[in-house]
């Protein structure tokens, strides 16, 4: 926990917008890198609202804060919309051939007769450089304009300290991790995807193929089943549709399932729920421990990619989204790191999985003006 650190950038410390409105932080009163300390402040009333980002590995420092105040609005302010500086891909991390090798390693483990692993999400990254400092507000507005149904977000990561000081996470996630309003709980997990196409007939064919894909439906069901197990001790009257729905963004078709329920104990807060669910198999795997251990071995620290971004107020209400389709901007805003991943099961084709990550990169790279 530390005092507010001033920044030269005119960006807010936090913004989250979506179909139900926008929440923007004004200033920072207190910062927390320790999730448990932040939860304690919320429960004691010291923190009237808590907001920020959770890393993929919650044993790592978080980027949570208590703001001086918040602005709630229907949409984002009229932030700058001018052009961004030229952005280029400096490196692929790892190179595509190495990513294919990682998938092959995962498939061997998944196919093992007595192996514990059923699914693992493997990601790759691209390192980006800009000719001049990037404005995170411009990037966020571009993302939201491109997909108004997504959850656009911007988080100052200074609370996490060290290399994250001054950095910012900016993205537009299609995936709601969890929302709490009173005793009502809602989750909308995503797993299974296919690319969009400019030709309407091909686009419809891609959607239909996804909906009927045994591999993608299996991958999706693993996510839903795991979330059911996590939610049952916390919620009653769980409603989980038997079949997933199709959801589309500008670049990707997804399978998704809307899950609803009622809290068994009203003292369970939105951040409690987020921590109980994270990381879901949509970004980690099944079982969680085996999958996250393999991810750590093959990828190293993911940082805030595939974590969660959101807020929780003193009543326990809040929204948390999965931090995908994003980039972490460096403190000087002249560099960025973007990730994309895909769910690997025994039936996965490595080339298809590589192509899936390329498709998923499109959201953030298009907003940055990167030629693909």
UniProtKB/Swiss-Prot annotation:
Active site: 119 (proton acceptor), 175 (proton donor)
Reaction catalysis annotation: chorismate = isochorismate
Involved pathway(s): Quinol/quinone metabolism; 1,4-dihydroxy-2-naphthoate biosynthesis; 1,4-dihydroxy-2-naphthoate from chorismate: step 1/7; Quinol/quinone metabolism; menaquinone biosynthesis
EC number(s) on file: 5.4.4.2
Keywords: Isomerase, Magnesium, Menaquinone biosynthesis, Metal-binding
Source organism superkingdom: Bacteria
Needed cofactors: Mg(2+)
EC top class, as a word: isomerase
Signal peptide bounds: none
Entry keyword annotation includes Cell wall biogenesis/degradation: no
GO process annotations (BP): menaquinone biosynthetic process
Ligand binding (Mg(2+)): 219, 356
Molecular function via GO: isochorismate synthase activity; metal ion binding
Disulfide bond annotation, renumbered to this chain: none
InterPro entries membership: ADC_synthase (IPR005801), Chorismate_C (IPR015890), IsoChor_synthase (IPR004561)
NCBIfam families referenced in this protein's UniProt entry, alphabetically: isochor_syn
The family this protein is said to belong to: Belongs to the isochorismate synthase family.
Task performed by this protein: Catalyzes the conversion of chorismate to isochorismate.
Protein name: Putative isochorismate synthase MenF
Gene: menF
């Amino acid at each position: 926990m530390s005092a507010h650190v001033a920044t030269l950038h005119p960006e807010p410390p936090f913004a989250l917008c979506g179909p139900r409105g926008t929440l923007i932080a004004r200033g920072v009163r207190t910062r927390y890198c320790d999730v448990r300390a932040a939860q304690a402040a919320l429960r004691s009333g010291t923190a009237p609202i808590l907001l920020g980002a959770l890393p993929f590995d919650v044993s790592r420092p978080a980027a949570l804060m208590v703001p001086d105040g918040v602005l709630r609005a229907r949409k984002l302010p009229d932030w700058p919309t001018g052009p961004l500086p030229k952005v280029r891909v400096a490196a692929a991390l790892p190179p595509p051939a190495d990513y294919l090798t990682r998938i092959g390693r995962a498939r061997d483990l998944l196919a093992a007769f007595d192996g514990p692993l059923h699914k693992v999400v493997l990601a790759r990254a691209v390192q980006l450089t800009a000719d001049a400092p990037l404005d995170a507000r411009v990037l966020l507005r571009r993302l939201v304009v491109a997909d108004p149904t997504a959850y656009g977000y911007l988080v100052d990561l200074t609370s996490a300290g060290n290399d994250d000081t001054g950095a910012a996470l900016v993205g537009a996630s299609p995936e709601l991790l969890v929302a709490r309003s009173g005793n009502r709980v809602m989750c909308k997990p995503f797993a299974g995807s296919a690319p969009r196409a400019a030709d309407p007939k091909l686009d419809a064919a891609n959607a239909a193929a996804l909906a009927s894909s045994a591999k993608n439906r299996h991958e999706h069901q693993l996510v839903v089943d795991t979330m059911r197990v996590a939610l049952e001790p916390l919620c009653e009257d769980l409603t989980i549709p038997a079949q997933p729905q199709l959801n589309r963004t500008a670049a990707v078709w997804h399978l998704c399932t809307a899950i609803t329920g009622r809290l068994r104990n009203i003292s369970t807060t939105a951040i409690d729920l987020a921590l109980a669910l994270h990381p879901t198999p949509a970004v980690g795997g099944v079982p969680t421990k085996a999958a996250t251990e393999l991810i750590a071995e093959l990828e190293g620290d993911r940082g805030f990619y595939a974590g969660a971004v959101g807020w929780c107020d003193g009543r326990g209400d809040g929204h948390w989204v999965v931090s995908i389709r994003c980039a972490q901007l460096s403190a000087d805003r002249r560099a960025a790191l973007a990730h994309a991943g895909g769910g690997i099961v025994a039936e996965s084709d490595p080339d298809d999985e590589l192509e899936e990550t390329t498709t998923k990169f499109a959201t953030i790279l298009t907003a940055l003006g990167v030629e693909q």
